[in-house]
A protein has these predicted regions:
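Short acidic, glycine/serine/threonine-rich loops at helix termini
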Residues: 34-37, 60, 81-85, 107-114, ...
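Thiamine diphosphate
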Residues: 1-133, 161, 224-225, 248, 369-504, 517, ...
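Short helix-loop-beta junction
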Residues: 37-43, 242-252, 468-474
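Flexible, low-complexity linker and terminal segments
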Residues: 1-8, 12, 18, 130-338, ...
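A glycine-rich helix N-cap at a beta->alpha junction
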Residues: 43-50, 91-102, 184-185, 426-439, ...
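Conserved thiamine diphosphate
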Residues: 104-153, 159, 194, 336, ...
Length: 536
């Protein structure tokens, strides 16, 4: 049956049809919907893990146990999962295992533009990259076949445009694979040095076998047209190329982007007069072609940053672009702001009022850096606020103590904040950490987390008590405030900054957009009574 699906939903459908049994992920745009959609299939056990490392390890455990598995994350989440990734490449798997990773060229919702293909190369793990929803579904099923045939986890690399664009897919029924037998195999699965040394040559042979597979797999296909121009491309760039050129260029479309074929590329290059490489972000395909001794045009014309478009491809290839309607440049700029009623506003107002130096983190509350609050000084990655305040205070000593705080959301705290908090307790840092507990993972679309008491399906689940956790870590000063109570917030911040020991303030009020939050009638300014004191 044909259906219209976004790419992420198509991957989820592929998981279902291929008989995936376990999916563990951490939400992160643009990857989130894969697991949300997979959770709609009762045959797949789905969960939100505290972070991407845990998710990958859960999927690995399920694969070793004999059940096809999946873990999903955005590109920066792969940094968190890198530790087990490199070792699992050595151990291999039992049942098939897919690692879904979504890159964000253009940084629509990310702090950097890293290219996940580097991880596939470094970890020596095969990577598939679809260019539309139909391929997303089909490639997912093929990925399990590759995983089990070559004893390896397999990357399914998405990007924002493929993940969130709709196209037609052909669905089929689920094929339920038998649970594979688990056999204890210390030499294969226990990566102490002696065993790892024996596994490394196996990994290298696997790569050679996969290169041979890349030469003939239908994942990579040649579309011959005009031979004056030859283009090697992948993912959404393929769609742009076809829209610009049609049959006026010959195209080698790569779906298996690690490892890359050699003979296939060399044969294609011989059939065209001039060879171009069109790929978003880094020059992975281009570098491979140059290693093969080919004269190619790539990043000397196409940018290393931002996402591509049809117009960009046409412009860089010297093809006239039809003029389109231009926006009225006088339209007011509308930068992102916190939602009306956002509980984080009260705490950031307090911190700004007290002229605190604020180490920020990743979440909706990163918008606390935006005017008029302008409260956050530094934001790097998830969990960095707590570790950074420790380093900041150790570096500046009494000069910064009593003036610097860290802010982190409840989900981010569970993701990677606990180790930083343990470091503060262990190394006796006089630092104040504010956990902004809005009872949900807000920025990625209201996903549950270990502090909410509900699982991915909305059913009751275990709930972490933040106050008890902080006290168990050795913090004597732990207090809870309502960020709507500005006086209480101001009092708490002043008292904890003045204390001569580390402390935690939990700023707790549910996200204003949660369905179960009681919404009071909106307030209006009485212009006749307003004194113009700018209190609002």
């Amino acid at each position: 049956m044909k259906q219209l699906m976004i790419g992420n939903a198509a991957v989820a459908r592929g998981l279902y049809e291929a008989g995936c049994g376990v999916a563990s992920s951490y939400p992160g745009t643009p990857s989130t919907e894969i697991t949300e959609e997979a959770a709609k299939y009762d045959e797949i056990y789905c969960e939100w893990a505290p972070n991407e490392k845990v998710a990958l390890e859960v999927a690995f455990g399920a694969a070793v146990a004999g059940k096809r598995s999946f873990c999903g994350m955005k590109h920066v989440g792969l940094n968190v999962a890198a530790d087990p990734l490199f070792t699992i490449s050595y151990t291999g798997i039992n049942a098939g295992m897919i690692i879904g990773v979504a890159d964000d060229a253009g940084m629509h919702s990310s702090q950097n533009e890293q290219d996940s293909r580097h991880y596939a190369i470094a970890a020596k793990v095969p990577m598939l990259e679809p260019s539309d929803s139909a391929e997303a579904l089909a490639f997912t099923k093929i990925a399990y076949e590759i995983s089990e045939k070559y004893d390896t986890p397999v990357f399914m690399k998405m990007c924002t445009r493929v993940a969130h664009s709709q196209s037609l897919v052909e669905t089929s029924e689920r094929v339920e694979p038998a649970l594979k037998e688990y056999k204890k195999d210390i030499a294969k699965y226990v990566m102490m040095p002696a065993n790892a040394k024996r596994r490394h040559p196996i990994v290298e042979q696997r790569t050679r076998d996969l290169i041979a597979y890349a030469e003939t797999t239908p994942l990579n296909r040649v579309e011959m047209g005009d031979t004056k121009i030859g283009i090697i491309t992948s993912s959404t760039s393929y769609q742009y190329v076809k829209e610009v050129f049609g049959d006026n260029a010959s195209v080698l479309k790569l779906g298996l982007i690690n490892p890359l074929p050699e003979k296939l590329i060399l044969d294609f290059a011989q059939k065209v007069d001039k060879l171009f490489i069109i790929e978003e972000l880094d020059d992975i395909i281009e570098s491979h072609c140059k290693k093969l001794g080919l004269d190619v045009t790539g990043k000397d014309v196409f940018p290393l940053e931002d996402e591509f478009s049809q117009n960009l491809v046409a412009e860089k290839m010297g093809i006239p672009v039809e003029e389109s309607l231009t926006l009225d440049e006088n339209i007011p700029v509308r930068p992102p702001v916190m939602c009306a009623g956002c509980p984080h506003r009260g705490m950031f107002y307090t911190l700004s009022k007290n002229k605190c130096t604020v180490m920020g983190d990743i979440g909706c509350y990163t918008l606390g850096a935006v005017a008029p609050l302008s409260a956050i000084d530094v934001t790097a990655c998830m969990g960095a606020s707590i570790s950074s305040i420790h380093g900041f205070n150790k570096a500046r000593g009494e000069e910064s103590e009593g003036k610097t705080v860290a802010v982190i959301g409840d989900s981010t705290f569970m993701h990677s904040g606990m180790t930083g908090l343990a470091n503060i307790a262990y190394n006796m840092s006089n630092s104040t950490v504010i956990i902004l507990d809005n009872s949900i993972t807000g920025m990625t679309g209201h996903q549950q987390n270990p502090t909410t008491g509900y699982n991915i399906k909305g059913d009751p689940a275990g709930k972490i008590n933040l106050e008890a956790l902080c006290k168990a870590m050795g913090f004597n000063r732990v207090r809870v405030v309502d960020p709507y109570d500005l006086e209480a917030c101001d009092k708490a911040v002043k008292e904890e900054l003045a204390a001569a020991e580390p402390s935690v303030i939990i700023s707790r009020r549910p996200c204003a957009l949660l369905k179960y939050v009681e919404v009071k009638p909106p307030l209006n300014v009485d212009k006749d009574k307003c004194k113009g004191c700018k209190c609002a």
